[in-house]
C-alpha cells in the first residue's frame, strides 16, 4: 500500500512555485508533502518535472512537464531523450502535447506504467485568484502600473547582448507601462545572473521601467499586462493561454550554444518581428488589440485544457490510481505498439545510459567520476590529434 506522502522534486524557483500550488491541494486531501531539490530523494510518491529524473528512488512516480514548450526542437518525440516508461503516471498540459504523444505512443518509452492523462497546465490554476478584482487592483498598485495606459511585458528565455536595453528603448517612445520580468536563474548560471544585474543597474533609475523580482510568478506579471515580448520563452505560450498577444523578436540571439543561435519561434500563436521593427509592431498590436487578443483567446480555447482547475484533476487521478478506485478520468489510448527503429533504439539506449552515468553514478561515486573524467580526457586527446 502506497502511503499518502508526496515528495515534489524541483530544480529552480519556478518549478517550486508550481509544486507549492499542487502541494496545497494535496494537503487538503490528507497527503503529507515535501518539497526538495534533492533529485536522489527516497520517497513514497515522487513527483517529477525535470528533463532528467531518478524515479527508481520512489515507490510510485508522477511525471509532468516543467515547460509548456519543453524540448521544442525535438518535437514530437521528446520521449526519445526523456522516456516516461520508468514512471507510473504522466500528465500532459494541452491538446498540442496530446498530439505529440499520440505520434510517439506506439513506442514503449513514451508510455508510463499506468497511463498518460490530459490534465492541463497547473500554473494556470492561479488564474482564479485574479477573478477577484480587489486582489488584482492591489497588485497593480503595489508594482506601480498606470491603469490608464496599456502595459507591455518583457520576459525573455535568456538575457544577453543587451536585449533588455533594446526592448526598453523600443518602448520608451510609446505611452505604455514598461515591465521587465527576468527568469529566476540559479547560481550555476553565472553569466545570466551577471547580465541581468547589469541590465537592472542600467534601468533602475528610469521611472518608466518597472523591474519585477525575478522570483515573481510569471502569470502574475502576464495578468496585469496587455502584450508580452520575448524570443523563444514558454512565457509566450502562457501569455496566449491567458488571451494576451505574444511577440517573438526573431533576431534576438539565444546563447545556449556557441556561436549563439536565432530563437526557435516558429509557433503558430506568436507575432514575429525583428528588433529594428519592435516599436512599430507594438503600435500595430495596440491599434488592433481586439483582433490580436481574440486570436490569442481562440488559440487558447482550442488547445488548452481545464484552465483554472487542472490541479484538482491531477489529484483526483492520483487518488484513484494509488487507492485502486474507479477513475473518472480516462487515460489516453496509445497506438498499437511498434518496435523502435534500430537507429532510434540505439540512440535512446545510449542517451539513457550516458545520462544515468553522468547525472547519477558520477555524482554519487568518486571512483566513477574519476573514470569518467579520465575517459573524457582521452577522448579529447584523440580528437585533438585527428584535428591536428
Where are the model-predicted features located?
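Active-site and donor-binding regions of nucleotide-sugar-utilizing enzymes
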Residues: 4-133
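Conserved catalytic-core segment of nucleotide-activated headgroup transferases in glycan assembly
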Residues: 2, 7-10, 15-22, 122-198, ...
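C-terminal amphipathic helix plus adjacent low-complexity
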Residues: 276, 280-388
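Structural alpha-helical scaffold elements that stabilize or flank donor/cofactor-binding regions
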Residues: 39-40, 83, 170, 220-221, ...
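Nucleotide-activated donor-binding/catalytic signature segment of Leloir-type glycosyltransferases, i.e.
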Residues: 193-214
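A donor-sugar binding/catalytic signature common to diverse glycosyltransferases
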Residues: 57-65, 215-258
